[in-house]
Amino acid sequence: MVEEIVKEINLFAAEREWNQFHTPKNIASSIIIESAELLECFQWQDPTISDVVEDIKLLESVEEEIADVMIYSLRLCSLLGRDPIEIMRAKLEKNAEKYPVSESKGSAKKYSDL
């Protein structure tokens, strides 16, 4: 499933001859920009999960920005020859070590403050 969408993303860029612009720095910058646009969906409000799900317009905006962040993230993985699933699993393992359940359960503290 991930491989299929990565192929679609790469084809989308290739058809438009955008590969020349897709440097690691440019893609990383785009991830930050799209992440900021995701955050902008919540500017001056702090909705609950159910608030977001029930507000169709807000939910659609959030989905669009999540998609942009994920597309650029998958594109960067592809450009660097990295498997996004392997990268995420490795990071989850590291996070499990940093945030053991016994010390972090119910806590918002950073691992260095546990």
Where are these regions (language model features)?
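Flexible "arm" and connector segments at domain edges
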Residues: M1-I66, M70-L114
